[in-house]
């Protein structure tokens, strides 16, 4: 097989094809979905494998821990190892992990398998900077936005798709189907992706150490990571607590109806290509302001109507769409800004950015559960409102030099 080789040192002059963008976006969505398939099935899986109610939470927790560790220790390899080979190997690891989860006879091997599913799912965070490498500066935001739209659709659709599939096949069948999809995806990526050999010649240990240096000495990375951590915290809080709220006495929705609610929220993924185009035109500052304000307002509108009414349900659907739109917008703007800082350490920058993003989401989920248990939706929603407001306060302290850097980047 012959393959194209992307010169890591040479700026790209021609943008990648629409077909390649679609492939990368689809790959991101399919791989990211692996992180979420188990969430609506956790109760059934725990019961079959003999896990207690408390221990069942480990299914989601270990997947998230694996993903977080992968962001810190695997994603930076994109600056060191030939990218196509790294992406395909990571997707191949996902195949093995999903099969192991499907065939696990009891809890211990299953939990080990979902931990590996989490680690291997970081392939998405290799694909996004890979797309940026293949794209000239002038259209990088648009391309990254389109690829990120696939990621967000995968995240939003994974839970309802898993719930629907489980009506026809067992939870083991869901994992096996995903493994089959990953096999096909790995073969397609190997066949169609160009090779890209990074310039970095650092030892792996030095590569990891350099991430700390980048985190300490890159103001744009610090700010964009902080904004997105708060935004993803609000996003995770919303999607942790709304299923509880909708299934509770105010609305009494079934699991199928809640899945439809989640599908409506996926409409917010259309923000990704729009945000990318705004960043390419130098509108990052204004678009970020819009995203932070929109996220805060999304929580406020849920208090306009009385609980349990048709209007209040419609406002929750609207809040889901606008919140997802805002979070996706801010994510794409952040990645566009940090990818402009330097091609030679793009994967490390993305690893730091996404690890911070992920920690914000984990904290938001934990705080959301606590707030809902303490004060139902009222407490959870006001906490969700506070997160983007805090990010907005920090954002408004940006100096002129930082605004100029964002506009030029």
Regions found by a protein language model. Give the residues of each.
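Conserved MFS/SLC helix-loop-helix module at the cytosolic interface between two early adjacent transmembrane helices
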Residues: 69-107
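Structural signature of the two symmetry-related core transmembrane helices
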Residues: 85-99, 286-301, 385
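Helix-loop-helix hairpin linking two adjacent transmembrane segments in secondary transporters
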Residues: 139, 146-193
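Cytoplasmic helix-loop-helix junction between adjacent transmembrane helices
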Residues: 113-150
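Helix-to-loop junctions at the C-terminal end of transmembrane segments
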Residues: 71-82, 271-284, 372
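Intracellular juxtamembrane helix-capping segments at the cytosolic ends
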Residues: 123-135, 328-342
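Juxtamembrane intracellular "pre-TM" segments in multi-pass secondary transporters
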Residues: 6-14, 193-226
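C-terminal transmembrane helical hairpin of 12-TM major facilitator-type secondary transporters
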Residues: 286-333
């Amino acid at each position: 097989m012959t393959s194209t080789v992307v010169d890591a040192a040479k700026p790209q002059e021609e943008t990648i094809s629409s077909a390649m963008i679609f492939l990368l976006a689809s790959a991101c969505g399919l791989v990211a979905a692996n992180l979420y398939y188990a969430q609506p099935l956790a109760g059934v899986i725990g019961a079959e494998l003999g896990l207690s109610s408390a221990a069942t939470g480990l299914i989601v927790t270990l997947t998230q821990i694996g993903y977080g560790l992968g962001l810190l220790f695997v994603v930076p390899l994109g600056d060191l190892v030939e990218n196509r080979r790294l992406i395909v190997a990571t997707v191949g690891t996902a195949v093995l992990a999903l099969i192991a989860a499907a065939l696990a006879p009891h809890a211990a091997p299953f939990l080990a398998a979902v931990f590996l599913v989490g680690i291997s799912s970081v392939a998405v965070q290799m694909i996004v900077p890979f797309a940026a490498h293949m794209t000239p500066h002038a259209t990088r935001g648009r391309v990254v936005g389109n690829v990120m739209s696939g990621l967000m659709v995968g995240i939003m659709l994974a839970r309802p798709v898993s719930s629907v599939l489980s009506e026809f096949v067992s939870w083991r069948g869901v994992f096996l189907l995903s493994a089959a999809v990953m096999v096909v995806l790995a073969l397609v990526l190997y066949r169609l992706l160009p090779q890209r050999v990074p310039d970095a010649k650092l030892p792996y240990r030095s590569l990891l150490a350099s991430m700390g240096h980048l985190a300490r000495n890159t103001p744009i990375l610090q700010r964009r990571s902080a904004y997105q951590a708060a935004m993803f915290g609000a996003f995770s809080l919303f999607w942790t607590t709304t299923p509880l709220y909708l299934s509770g006495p105010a609305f009494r929705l079934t699991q199928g109806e809640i899945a439809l609610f989640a599908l409506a929220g996926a409409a917010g993924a259309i923000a990704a290509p729009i945000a990318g185009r705004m960043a390419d035109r130098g509108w990052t500052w204004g678009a970020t302001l819009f995203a932070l304000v929109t996220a805060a307002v999304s929580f406020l509108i849920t208090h306009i109507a009385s609980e349990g009414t048709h209007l209040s349900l419609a406002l929750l659907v609207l809040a889901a769409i606008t919140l997802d739109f805002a979070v996706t917008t801010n994510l794409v703007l952040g990645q566009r800004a940090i990818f402009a800082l330097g091609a030679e350490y793009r994967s490390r920058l993305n690893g730091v950015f996404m690890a911070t993003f992920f920690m914000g989401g984990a904290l938001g989920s934990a705080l959301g559960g606590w707030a809902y248990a303490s004060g139902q939706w009222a407490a959870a929603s006001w906490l969700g409102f506070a997160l983007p407001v805090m990010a907005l306060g920090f954002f408004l302290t940006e100096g002129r030099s930082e605004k100029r850097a964002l506009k030029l980047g």
